Amino acid sequence: MLWSRFIQPRLISLACGSKPFMVQRTKIVPLAEGNVLEIGIGSGLNIPLYDKDLVKKIIGVDPSTEMQSLAKKRINESPVDVELISIDAAEIPLEDQSIDTIVCTYTLCTVPNPQGVLKEMKRVLKPGGKFLFSEHGHAPDESVKKFQYKLEPVWKFLADGCHLTRSIPEILNKSGMKIHTMETMYLPSTPRFVGFNYWGIAINH
């Protein structure tokens, strides 16, 4: 289908690469170190933000081959080795405790089974390893929240399964990883229904 194969991936990459979202990415991605697993690497928007002096290798997981094709230029220009794996993040083909840092930006909103994905993250992340996240989700204001619930069925179709109402702290707390730091705010120049942002660091225990 033309929409899902060509138009939708490019629109999502464009929206997720807008300035407010890129500013949020710069707050967490440079903190990654060692062997890094990026969940939902998509079109590779985070790749230029990694610190080449801290990161040994980036393993990017994404089920969308269309998105991965959009990432090729950034991968080719990266000073850090990037390996792409085309698979659902609920079945990560990596050994237990083999990853130092996991990065996840604007992906927990879309995965069909966030708890299953986080269970896999916890399995492959070393004890004491960092989970760096920046996600949009459930807004605190009642009027915004009501609009999110009304819009969500249509939004999920338009935005490849993206949910507007997921509570990121609740999802993380259920995973067994401990939230070390977390900040929230409405992103500037962004519609409030999609602009309430959670970002921070969780530690694997």
Residue ranges and their predicted role:
Residues 37-39, 43-91:
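Class I SAM-dependent methyltransferase SAM/SAH-binding core
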Residues 100-113:
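A short SAM/SAH-binding and catalytic strip from SAM-dependent methyltransferases
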Residues 87-102:
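A short acidic, Gly/Pro-enriched loop at the edge of an enzyme's catalytic core
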Residues 177, 184-205:
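Core SAM-dependent methyltransferase catalytic element
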Residues 160-176:
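Short alpha-helix
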Residues 15-35, 45-49:
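Conserved alpha-helix/loop element of class I SAM-dependent methyltransferases that forms part
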Residues 128-136:
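Conserved beta-strand signature within the Rossmann-like core of class I S-adenosyl-L-methionine
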Residues 115-127:
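A short glycine-rich, Lys/Arg-flanked "PGG" loop and its adjoining helix->strand segment in the class I
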